[in-house]
């Protein structure tokens, strides 16, 4: 997604007179690294949220949306090591619909997400010659 977003920004800037104004504005990620980040504590909280009766979606959302992508990757690895199974697969089993899609997307690296979105967007493109 980041690559596509950057491409669209560059394409838009070609004919835009406000380019300098926009370039000077502060940007970047709104999610900051947590100084006291502990992946094993997050793994425990996520495991509890997944296994509790009724699934604690609020805890899952709270943890995954308040961590940087690098921290989410550490959580994934720590979960795999501690539980011997994939965090993504466990979340897919208990979550449904759009929430499942968003949570699974949050667990991907930016490159994985971009590649899968580009592949999905091009699926079915081409001609059907007869």
UniProtKB/Swiss-Prot annotation:
Cited SMART domains: ANX
Record-linked InterPro entries: Annexin, Annexin_repeat, Annexin_repeat_CS, Annexin_sf, ANX1
Compartment(s) of residence: Nucleus; Cytoplasm; Cell projection, Cilium; Basolateral cell membrane
Annotated Ca(2+) 5 binding sites: 130
Keywords, comma-separated and alphabetical: Adaptive immunity, Annexin, Calcium, Calcium/phospholipid-binding, Cell membrane, Cell projection, Cilium, Cytoplasm, Cytoplasmic vesicle, Endosome, Immunity, Inflammatory response, Innate immunity, Isopeptide bond, Membrane, Metal-binding, Nucleus, Phospholipase A2 inhibitor, Phosphoprotein, Repeat, Secreted
Chief location category: nucleus
Residues annotated for Ca(2+) 3 binding in this entry: 122, 124, 126
The protein's name: Annexin A1
Positions of disulphide bridges: none
Organism ancestry: Eukaryota, Metazoa, Chordata, Craniata, Vertebrata
Source organism per UniProt: Gallus gallus
Binding sites annotated in the UniProt record for Ca(2+) 2: 92, 95, 100
GO biological process: actin cytoskeleton organization; adaptive immune response; cellular response to glucocorticoid stimulus; G protein-coupled receptor signaling pathway, coupled to cyclic nucleotide second messenger; granulocyte chemotaxis; inflammatory response; innate immune response; monocyte chemotaxis
Miscellaneous note of the record: Was originally identified as calcium and phospholipid binding protein that displays Ca(2+)-dependent binding to phospholipid membranes and can promote membrane aggregation in vitro. Was initially identified as inhibitor of phospholipase A2 activity (in vitro). Inhibition of phospholipase activity is mediated via its phospholipid binding activity that limits the access of phospholipase to its substrates.
Phosphoserine carried by residues: 24
Pfam (any one): Annexin
GO MF assignments: calcium ion binding; calcium-dependent phospholipid binding; phospholipase A2 inhibitor activity
Assigned GO CC terms: apical plasma membrane; basolateral plasma membrane; cytoplasm; early endosome membrane; extracellular exosome; extracellular space; lateral plasma membrane; motile cilium
Residues annotated as binding Ca(2+) 1: 54-55, 57
Origin: domain of life: Eukaryota
Record-stated family: Belongs to the annexin family.
Binding residues annotated for Ca(2+) 4, in chain numbering: 127
Annexin repeat segments: 37-108, 109-130
Linked residues for Isoglutamyl lysine isopeptide (Gln-Lys) (interchain with K-?): 19
Membrane topology (UniProt): Peripheral membrane protein
Record note on domains: The full-length protein can bind eight Ca(2+) ions via the annexin repeats. Calcium binding causes a major conformation change that modifies dimer contacts and leads to surface exposure of the N-terminal phosphorylation sites; in the absence of Ca(2+), these sites are buried in the interior of the protein core. The N-terminal region becomes disordered in response to calcium-binding. The N-terminal 26 amino acids are sufficient for its extracellular functions in the regulation of inflammation and wound healing. Acylated peptides that contain the first 26 amino acids of the mature protein can activate signaling via the formyl peptide receptors.
């Amino acid at each position: 997604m980041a690559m596509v977003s950057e491409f669209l920004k560059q394409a838009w800037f070609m004919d835009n007179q406000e380019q300098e104004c926009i370039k000077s504005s502060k940007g970047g990620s709104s999610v900051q690294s947590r100084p006291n980040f502990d992946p094993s504590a997050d793994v425990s909280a996520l495991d509890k949220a997944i296994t509790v009766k009724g699934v604690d979606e609020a805890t899952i959302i709270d943890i995954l949306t308040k961590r940087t992508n690098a921290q989410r990757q550490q959580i994934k690895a720590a979960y795999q090591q501690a539980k011997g199974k994939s965090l993504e697969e466990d979340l897919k089993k208990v979550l449904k619909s759009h929430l499942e899609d968003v949570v699974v997307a949050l667990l991907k690296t930016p490159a994985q997400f971009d590649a899968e979105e580009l592949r999905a967007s091009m699926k079915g493109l081409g001609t059907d010659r007869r």
